[in-house]
């Protein structure tokens, strides 16, 4: 079980919850802090102090005083009116990640919600009930208002959920399971929707998939090196230590490990003096991707454990401060950086595909075809890879440089962080398919060279990958092969071998 403390949630924890079904609990210290902050809110209400979000309107209506008798209606109206998301629903993993992250933020004790609110989130997580949350509509400040409102709808018995693969009304799901919806009290509606948990949830899923794919990309590149009889000297440790980037040094070391014992790779001068950049510069380019992933990971870890509500309560409610922790700029920048890095991983992989299929660049059969001319082989696979690379270049345009004022210009600068995160996830999906295409072509190339001469590590990859996509002996519908290989990679195909 992962115990939320509001301070110690890790990416490994998120992976365990989202992909392995590990349950979630709450530490006793968090329970104490939640209850203390709630008492502070109730005292504010009792004393009649005017505090934003507790007894005022929202956004441009922040100067409108709300009567105590209207508090519950205020919170309900906030959720209903802000649930304006459009587009397709987020995946179950992202929906669940949003709940985990929101529960963890509320567990810090700065938001003033009742313990029942956090417990309801944990119940949904642990019973695998996934709010149906539209993916479009967030400006990334004040946080992810629209998507988080769709999450909050479920807590009050409204909206829709997915349960056991079926989409249904929240009311019918709760009735089936005997769950009582909440009636939100002072500040709780705002506390649920004012934060960066949508962009961070998408970012977490994008990062986890990107990290796995970065390792797999090295494995596939190693097979390509054998298929093209690449020059191993370029991975010599001395070259990379001379530059000094640790990530580059690490990639070179993994490439040496993967290719150890290969009789297909060559030495410089044996067949040619040097390779093209897409082979020779694997450590430099892939290493730079790892540098970017390190930056993204650091920012996600901070945001996963951040208080992003507004206002925040300090000193047992003596200080209630309106700030801007809901502004998604740090995650927006990180996601834009992830877009760039993963787009580059796709760029260099596609160039290796071109070298595998272009008869002017190798001595393999044209387009790896078993009967060139009569059969086209992998010709159009390279087209698809090029198309995905081009799409990624468009998606990698930074979302964070845009801002459109909202709420009558009260919220006059926004992050567009959720757009950046969605783009990053789409790029990762595209790059996975590019890597799948490289893998299919590399497997075919080494089969022409002779698999007996492969390195032990790459041969292990070959054997397992061939169970997914068989040898190309004649033209067939290769779309099925690409999707099968991409799904295998998504499920973790041979990522562990790169780490050994």
From Swiss-Prot:
CDD domains found in the cross-reference section: PAL-HAL (cd00332)
An annotated GO BP: L-histidine catabolic process to glutamate and formate
E.C. numbers: 4.3.1.3
GO cellular component terms attached to this protein's record: cytoplasm
EC top class named in words: lyase
InterPro entries, per database record: Aromatic_Lyase, Fumarase/histidase_N, HutH, L-Aspartase-like, Phe/His_NH3-lyase_AS
Cross-link entry 5-imidazolinone (Ala-Gly), positions: 141-143
Keyword Lyase belongs to the record: yes
Modification after translation, per record: Contains an active site 4-methylidene-imidazol-5-one (MIO), which is formed autocatalytically by cyclization and dehydration of residues Ala-Ser-Gly.
Catalysed conversion reaction: L-histidine = trans-urocanate + NH4(+)
Main location: cytoplasm
Modified residues (2,3-didehydroalanine (Ser)): 142
Annotated NCBIfam families: hutH, PRK09367.1
HAMAP family linked to this entry: His_ammonia_lyase
Similarity section: Belongs to the PAL/histidase family.
Official protein name in the record: Histidine ammonia-lyase
């Amino acid at each position: 079980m992962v115990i939320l403390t509001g301070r110690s949630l890790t990416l490994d924890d998120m992976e365990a919850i989202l992909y392995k079904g590990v349950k979630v609990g709450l530490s006793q210290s968090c329970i104490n802090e939640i209850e203390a902050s709630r008492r502070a809110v109730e005292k504010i209400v009792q004393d009649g102090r005017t505090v934003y979000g507790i007894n005022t309107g929202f956004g441009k209506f922040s100067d409108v005083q709300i009567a105590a008798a209207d508090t519950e209606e205020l919170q309900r109206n906030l959720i209903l009116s802000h649930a304006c998301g459009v587009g397709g629903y987020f995946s179950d993993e992202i929906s669940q990640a949003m709940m985990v992250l929101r529960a963890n933020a509320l567990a810090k004790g700065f938001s003033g919600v009742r313990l029942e609110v956090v417990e309801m989130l944990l119940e949904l997580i642990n019973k695998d009930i996934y709010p149906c949350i539209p993916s479009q509509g967030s400006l990334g400040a004040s946080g992810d208002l629209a998507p988080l409102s769709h999450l909050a709808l479920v807590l009050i018995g409204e909206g829709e959920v997915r349960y056991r693969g079926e989409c249904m009304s929240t009311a019918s799901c709760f009735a089936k399971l005997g769950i009582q919806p909440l009636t939100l009290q002072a500040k709780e509606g705002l506390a649920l929707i004012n934060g960066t948990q949508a962009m961070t949830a998408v970012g977490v899923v994008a990062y986890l998939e990107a990290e796995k794919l970065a390792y797999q990309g090295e494995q596939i590149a190693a097979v390509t090196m054998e298929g093209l009889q690449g020059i191993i000297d370029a991975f010599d440790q001395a070259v990379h230590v001379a530059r000094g980037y640790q990530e580059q040094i690490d990639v070179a070391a993994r490439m040496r490990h993967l290719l150890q014992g290969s009789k297909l790779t060559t030495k410089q001068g044996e067949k040619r003096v040097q390779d093209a950049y897409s082979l020779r510069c694997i450590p430099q380019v892939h290493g730079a991707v790892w540098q970017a992933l390190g930056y993204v990971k650091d920012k996600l870890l901070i945001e996963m454990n951040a208080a992003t509500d507004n206002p925040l309560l300090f000193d047992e409610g003596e200080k209630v401060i309106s700030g801007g922790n809901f502004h998604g700029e740090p995650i927006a920048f990180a996601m834009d950086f992830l877009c760039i890095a993963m787009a580059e991983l796709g760029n260099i992989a596609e160039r290796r595909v071109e070298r595998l299929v272009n008869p002017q660049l190798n001595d393999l059969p044209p387009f790896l075809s078993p009967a060139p001319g009569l059969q086209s082989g992998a010709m159009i696979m390279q087209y698809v890879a090029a198309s995905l690379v081009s799409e990624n270049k468009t998606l990698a345009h930074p979302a964070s440089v845009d801002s459109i004022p909202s709420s009558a210009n009260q919220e006059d600068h926004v992050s567009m962080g959720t757009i950046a995160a969605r783009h990053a996830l789409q790029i990762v999906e595209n790059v996975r398919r590019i890597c799948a295409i490289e893998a299919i072509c590399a497997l075919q190339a080494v089969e022409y060279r002779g698999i007996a001469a492969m390195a032990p590590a790459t041969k292990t990859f070959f054997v397992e990958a061939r169970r997914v996509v068989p040898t190309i002996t004649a033209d067939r519908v290769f779309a099925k092969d690409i999707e099968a290989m991409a799904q295998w990679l998504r499920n973790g195909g041979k990522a562990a071998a790169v780490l050994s």
